[in-house]
A protein has these predicted regions:
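Sec-dependent N-terminal signal peptides of Gram-positive bacterial secreted proteins and lipoproteins
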Residues: 1-23
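N-terminal capping/linker segments that flank leucine-rich repeat
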Residues: 22-27, 34-57, 66-78, 87, ...
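Asp/Glu-rich intrinsically disordered low-complexity tracts
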Residues: 24, 29-32, 37-38, 43-50, ...
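Non-cytosolic beta-sheet module surface loops
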Residues: 80-84, 121, 157, 220-221, ...
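Conserved structural position at the C-terminal beta-strand
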Residues: 131-133
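Glycine-centered tight beta-turn/hairpin loop motif at sheet-sheet or coil-to-beta transitions
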Residues: 135-137, 222
Length: 359
């Protein structure tokens, strides 16, 4: 390889991070590494007591002046702005025959959980939502308007957490639902656990089939097991579905414009169905049960391949990847790397903890 391999790591000095978001490395040709709540402070009457001033300030922070619109039979989840901690909180409404409410935690550990409120509309009307602490103090207040039924152009989401996230992100006219037209205008959906604490509650991607112009979709730490709703999103260029229990990815074979695909930390074992993805420049199946990577021989544009912590033992298919720049294959069963010998663009190879590889 005549010095083209700048880093060949055979023993534990360099490890790539577990979360690789299908990004390109810095190369001589490409220097890019590719890959309010407004606090409402009210004027306080100077003649008032210090106690009343404190109360006014509390309510200015705790009350959302915008009315939340919901629809009968279509629960949503909203963030309540409650602090972390073990203190118990309760959610209720001014008329629970019209709408009920319940607290949901983003984590089983209350010390770190973000508390959300699920609103369950029963019949049309108006109520006030109250979130109270263990002493009965109101920490959050929200006006709720319940309308009878969703308009016909509403996206038929099956998952409350996903619907609630997209309602916040793409409901451009604040009418309480995401229309098919609105969702078709969305180009990026990025859901990390650290950015959307309810990601663990997302179980169903139904409805995303209407995101026809979606180019980037990142789903981290969800409970999704079926990616079939993504099969028609042919404009997708970057797809990350990591740390989930998906096993079947055959429906992704239609996504012929994909350039970056990250399936790290999933339960997949077979990637042979990805043969149509000839535009991929980055593929990550890190920490999966994949054992055969021969499908990559058809991915002539591939520059970055991440197969660490898999059962892969044969990398002969990589010999066809004339544009490959990086191969990360730590903790695999690889025993022969002769397939790499003629890859003139290969600059980075990581083979830490490959016990079958002779020194």
């Amino acid at each position: 390889m005549k010095n083209k391999i700048l880093a060949l790591v055979l023993a534990g000095t360099m490890l790539f991070g577990q979360n690789v978001y299908a990004t390109e490395l810095v190369t001589p040709e490409n220097n890019d590494v590719t890959e309010n709540e407004n606090n409402i402070v009210q004027d306080i009457d100077k003649s008032g007591t210090e106690e009343s001033a404190e109360q006014n300030e509390l309510y200015s922070d705790a009350t959302n002046e915008n009315t939340q619109i919901v629809y009968v039979g279509n629960p949503i989840i909203i963030e309540s702005k409650i602090n972390y901690g073990r203190e118990p909180y309760t959610a209720s409404t001014s008329d629970e025959s019209i709408c009920t409410a319940e607290i949901k935690n983003s984590s089983n550990d209350d010390r770190w959980a973000t508390r959300f409120v699920q609103i369950n509309p029963i019949k049309s009307g108006k109520v006030t939502l109250y979130v109270k602490d263990g002493s009965g103090n109101v920490n959050y207040e929200q006006e709720i308007e319940i309308r009878q039924s969703l308009p016909e152009d509403a996206v038929p989401f099956k998952d409350v957490a996903l619907k609630s996230y997209l309602l916040e992100q793409s409901n451009f006219n604040d009418d309480g639902y995401v229309s098919k037209e609105e969702l078709s205008q969305v180009t990026d959906i990025i859901i990390y656990r650290n950015s959307y604490r309810m990601s663990d509650y997302i179980t169903d991607l139904g409805g995303l089939e209407y995101a026809s112009n979606l180019k980037t979709l990142i789903l981290d730490n969800t409970a999704v097991t079926d990616v079939t709703p993504l099969s028609g999103l042919t404009q997708l260029e970057q797809l990350t579905i990591e740390n989930t229990d998906i096993t079947d990815i055959s429906s992704l074979n239609n996504l012929v414009n994909l350039k970056r695909l990250d399936l790290s930390g999933t339960n997949i074992s077979d990637i042979s169905t990805l043969g149509n993805l000839k535009n991929l420049v980055s593929l990550s199946v890190y920490n999966t049960r994949v054992s055969d990577c021969s499908v990559v021989s058809n991915m002539s544009k591939l520059k970055n391949l991440y197969i660490s912590n898999t059962d892969v033992s044969d990398i002969s298919a990589v010999a066809n990847l004339k544009d490959i720049v990086l191969l990360e294959a730590n903790s695999t069963k690889i025993s022969d790397i002769s397939a790499l010998s003629n890859l003139q663009n290969l600059m980075y190879v990581y083979l830490d903890d490959c016990s079958e590889l002779s020194s």
